[in-house]
């Protein structure tokens, strides 16, 4: 029975199945075959190649095709997938190409792996199968919230996973167990582990278990129908986990380019897949879309907490120069916080409170102005906040944040009672032993009155802006306040530097986290590590002075452009780098 488009999308979300394009499969297979030839084992005994989530067999076909092209015809193909219909399709396609000896099995690969080391892929006479020589895979990517807490916890315990568990984490561990020491792997993953805090355990696992050959960050090329940005990991399983890799790993990084000054000097390239196979760097025009490509050596810091940096020698020297000339990072002088998350915005956030009947119109004392990513703009918010307000359920008593007893605000309580069923439906609130009417993630109300810097969590360009009107902050924004009270100067310095081309360039190189389409994720884990010059230095003081003029003296457009250019120049001087 054919699935409707809606049913297919639901299945993709639940299973994480996004089949690999043929050309991309060929690129991965060709790279693995080339590494096989380098290893010297390609012409000896039979080579077992496994795809543990083979779907309709695309990657197995690529592996066979690239092997034959390189005169390697001793690869035994092994495919597993829990989708029985996909296995039938894979069997048909392989047989159609004259491949009659492939071993295909319907089942969950994660259930087939013996974690004690006696690995068996099938329940028949192949139960004694040895680990494989080669793995080519596009394992399912299913986020924790879709996977479900129970299965996520089970997988975490079973495969000794830490942090937020996605399904491909478990596949990485299971595939590594199934791979021979010295065996090769080419696997498509999310690229999030390269730079995210949540990727620490994956970075550690890969670095400890593999000599990394190359990582290809596919960026926002949209080669798959899913929204997840992909990377391809190539590695050789270590013979000894205790030996640290000494040979440098390579990287290839491709992202859509939107800067007109760069696209006007682009080089025409016929196909995106052809571009992926090349080692060319620069800006390329493929079907009227522009892509920036860089290649170089992967930087793997000693600490797995730090992101893996994919930078050319020139880029690496540039950020190293900035780091060496910095005084501290933002987190050394300031606290960074996430905005409010109510988990029931339709109940708590409105611009129409005044239109409610008097008996359920909340008292003004509990209605607070709200600012969100909709107001985000460089320097100052786009508008003077507007009428959107939040019914705030917390107050500060004796220096502690506490839920309000709404008996003192009868109209607000009456309003909340009209939505009691909805609010009590948030079982996690009740499970956390909180009052049914509370917003999920509040902040200390005393902090709202403080001057602060805000920035949206996702934006195509930096939009750090100053707020001093005592607003509450929505959960789609982050905010910065000084650790030392009344130290507004440090806010002006941070505001100036964070909005420059220099910090945008630093962010792109050091944290490498572009989203679709050309948008950047401004998480606190990144922004907190922005470098700062000495706040007392002359260049810093000049930045602070011109920021005051920009914020409080309402300069005309011409003067505003002059100030922004001044800030760019002063930032370059403060960090000892050339003007971008």
Curated annotation (Swiss-Prot):
Record flagged with keyword S-adenosyl-L-methionine: yes
GO MF assignments: DNA binding; site-specific DNA-methyltransferase (adenine-specific) activity
UniProt enzyme class: transferase
Catalysed reaction equations from the record: a 2'-deoxyadenosine in DNA + S-adenosyl-L-methionine = an N(6)-methyl-2'-deoxyadenosine in DNA + S-adenosyl-L-homocysteine + H(+)
Superkingdom to which the source organism belongs: Bacteria
GO biological process: DNA restriction-modification system; methylation
Keywords, comma-separated and alphabetical: DNA-binding, Methyltransferase, Restriction system, S-adenosyl-L-methionine, Transferase
Database matches in InterPro entries: DNA_methylase_N6_adenine_CS (IPR002052), MethylTrfase_TaqI-like_dom (IPR011639), N4_N6_ade-DNA_methylase (IPR050953), SAM-dependent_MTases_sf (IPR029063), TaqI_C (IPR025931)
Gene3D superfamilies referenced in this protein's UniProt entry, alphabetically: Vaccinia Virus protein VP39
EC id: 2.1.1.72
Family of this protein: Belongs to the N(4)/N(6)-methyltransferase family.
PANTHER family per record: DNA METHYLTRANSFERASE A, DNA METHYLTRANSFERASE YEEA-RELATED
Note: The protein sequnce was determined following expression in E.coli.
Protein name, UniProt field: Type II methyltransferase M.BanIII
Source taxonomy: Bacteria, Bacillati, Bacillota, Bacilli, Bacillales
């Amino acid at each position: 029975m054919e699935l409707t488009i809606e049913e297919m999308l639901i299945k993709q979300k639940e299973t994480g199945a996004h089949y690999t394009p043929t050309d991309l499969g060929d690129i991965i297979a060709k790279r693995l075959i080339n590494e096989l030839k380098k290893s010297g084992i390609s012409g000896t005994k039979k080579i077992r190649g496994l795809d543990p989530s083979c779907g309709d067999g695309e990657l197995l076909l690529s592996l066979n095709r690239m092997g034959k092209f390189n005169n390697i015809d001793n690869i035994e193909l092994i495919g597993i997938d829990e989708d029985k219909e996909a296995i039938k399709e894979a069997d048909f396609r392989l047989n159609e190409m004259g491949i009659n000896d492939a071993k295909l099995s319907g089942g969950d690969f994660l259930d087939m792996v013996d974690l004690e080391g006696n690995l068996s892929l099938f329940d028949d006479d192949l139960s004694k199968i040895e680990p494989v020589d080669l793995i080519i895979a596009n394992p399912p990517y299913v986020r924790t919230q879709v996977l479900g807490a129970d299965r996520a916890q089970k997988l975490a315990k079973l495969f000794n996973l830490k942090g937020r568990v996605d399904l491909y984490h478990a596949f990485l561990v299971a595939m590594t167990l199934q791979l021979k020491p010295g065996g090769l792997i080419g696997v498509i993953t999310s690229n999030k582990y390269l730079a995210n805090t949540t990727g620490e355990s994956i970075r550690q696992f890969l670095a400890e278990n593999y000599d990394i050959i190359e990582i290809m960050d596919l960026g926002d090329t949209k080669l798959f129908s899913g929204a997840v940005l992909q990377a391809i990991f190539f590695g050789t399983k270590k013979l000894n986990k205790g030996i640290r890799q000494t040979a440098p790993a390579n990287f290839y990084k491709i992202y859509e380019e939107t800067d007109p000054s760069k696209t006007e000097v682009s080089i025409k390239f016929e196909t995106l897949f052809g571009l992926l196979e090349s080692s060319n760097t620069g800006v390329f025009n493929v079907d009227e879309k522009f892509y920036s490509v860089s290649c170089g050596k992967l930087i793997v810091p000693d600490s797995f907490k730090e992101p893996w940096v994919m930078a050319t020698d020139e880029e690496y020297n540039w950020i190293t120069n900035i780091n060496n000339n910095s005084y501290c990072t933002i987190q050394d002088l300031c606290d960074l916080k996430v905005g409010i998350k109510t988990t029931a915005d339709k109940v708590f956030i409105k611009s129409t409170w005044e239109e409610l009947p008097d008996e359920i119109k909340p008292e003004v004392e509990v209605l607070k102005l709200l600012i969100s990513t909709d107001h985000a703009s460089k320097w100052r918010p786009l508008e003077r906040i507007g009428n959107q307000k939040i019914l705030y359920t917390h107050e500060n008593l004796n220096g502690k944040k506490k839920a309000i007893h709404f008996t003192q605000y009868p109209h607000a309580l009456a309003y909340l009672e009209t939505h009691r069923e909805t609010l009590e439906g948030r079982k996690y609130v009740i499970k956390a032993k909180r009052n049914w009417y509370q917003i999920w993630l509040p902040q200390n109300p005393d902090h709202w009155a403080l001057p602060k810097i805000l920035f949206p969590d996702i934006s195509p360009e930096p939009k750090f802006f100053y707020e001093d009107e005592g607003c509450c902050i929505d959960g789609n924004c982050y905010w910065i306040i000084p650790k030392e009270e009344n130290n507004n100067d440090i806010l002006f310095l941070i505001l100036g530097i964070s909005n420059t081309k220099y910090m945008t360039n630093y962010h792109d190189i050091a944290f490498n986290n572009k989203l679709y389409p050309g948008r950047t994720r401004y998480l606190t884990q990144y922004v907190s590590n922005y470098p700062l010059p000495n706040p007392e230095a002359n260049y810093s003081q000049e930045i602070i002075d011109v920021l005051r003029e920009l914020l409080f003296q309402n300069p005309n457009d011409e003067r505003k452009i002059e100030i922004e250019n001044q800030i760019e120049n002063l930032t370059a001087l403060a960090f000892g780098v050339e003007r971008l």
